[in-house]
């Protein structure tokens, strides 16, 4: 665990060319405890500073765990850093583990509406204090810049904190992937002539967070 760091960023838009990073958050394990560290841009001129501080911190880790980070967070960090002439080798030298990419097969198995972080949290009954979206936080950040209201500052930090805390908590979903690789044992079956259906019951040794029962054509797993 000491080599892992969970990453989530908050931005003012979707493209680095017209947007900026206003918050970088990291969760890491140290001395038998989980810790959260956040770098907040309290003005439009402090983005470079938080990037430099974050890069100094991240060089101590070997794996970055994110949610859709390989598509969004990491490229965004690199492009924003490049705009300031910062060296981004530290990100290239760290392995990336994108939970979103690895959990794609789980969406169909669990019959999820989508693969958003909030959907996965709901499936696992993970509660969070913040209910707003990242898009809604952009307006909150701009309001903070105009007013300096510390309550808005806390709202921004909480949103990022809840996202960060969710990342380690959804990792047990990866165990569903082992279902496809494990050995199955026939536990029983029944044939119904009334409904013209065959039910097959199999045992799987994989431990998963929530039991799964799925109906397939001609059988039930």
Language-model regions, residue ranges each:
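DEDD superfamily 3′-5′ metal-dependent exonuclease/proofreading module
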Residues: 1-7, 14-19, 29-221
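Short beta-strand scaffold segments in enzyme catalytic cores
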Residues: 24-26
């Amino acid at each position: 665990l000491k080599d892992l760091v969970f990453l989530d960023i908050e931005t003012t838009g979707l493209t680095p060319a017209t947007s900026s990073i206003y918050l970088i958050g990291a969760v890491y394990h140290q001395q038998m405890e989980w810790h959260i560290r956040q770098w907040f841009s309290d003005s439009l001129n402090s983005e470079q500073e938080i990037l430099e501080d974050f890069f100094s911190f991240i060089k101590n880790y070997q794996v970055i765990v994110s949610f859709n980070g390989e598509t969004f967070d990491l490229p965004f960090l690199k492009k924003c850093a490049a705009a300031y002439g910062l060296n981004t080798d530290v990100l290239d030298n760290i392995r990336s583990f994108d939970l979103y990419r690895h959990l794609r097969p789980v969406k169909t198995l669990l019959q999820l509406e989508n693969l958003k972080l909030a959907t996965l949290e709901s499936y696992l009954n993970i509660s969070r204090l913040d209910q707003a979206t990242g898009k809604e936080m952009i307006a909150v950040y701009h309001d903070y810049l105009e007013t300096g209201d510390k309550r808005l500052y806390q709202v921004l930090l909480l949103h990022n904190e809840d996202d960060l805390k969710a990342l380690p908590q959804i990792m047990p979903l990866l165990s569903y992937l082992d279902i496809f690789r494990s050995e199955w044992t026939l536990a029983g079956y029944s044939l119904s002539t009334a409904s013209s259906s065959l039910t097959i019951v199999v045992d799987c040794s994989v431990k998963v967070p929530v039991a799964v029962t799925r109906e397939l054509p001609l059988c039930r797993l």
